[in-house]
Amino acid sequence: MRLRRLFKQPSTRVLGVTNCPRQQGHQKRREQPD
């Protein structure tokens, strides 16, 4: 239940990046200049 609240919070966005495949794609684009 606590994880569900964390995922909804923007603060955990960084932690959810590794859990969410969609967020990982966004971060990969930020790392690359493409």
Curated annotation (Swiss-Prot):
- Positions of the region Disordered? 1-34
Positions with biased composition (Basic residues):
25-34
Name of the protein in its database record: Uncharacterized protein C27E2.14
Q: Which organism is it from?
A: Schizosaccharomyces pombe (strain 972 / ATCC 24843) (Fission yeast)
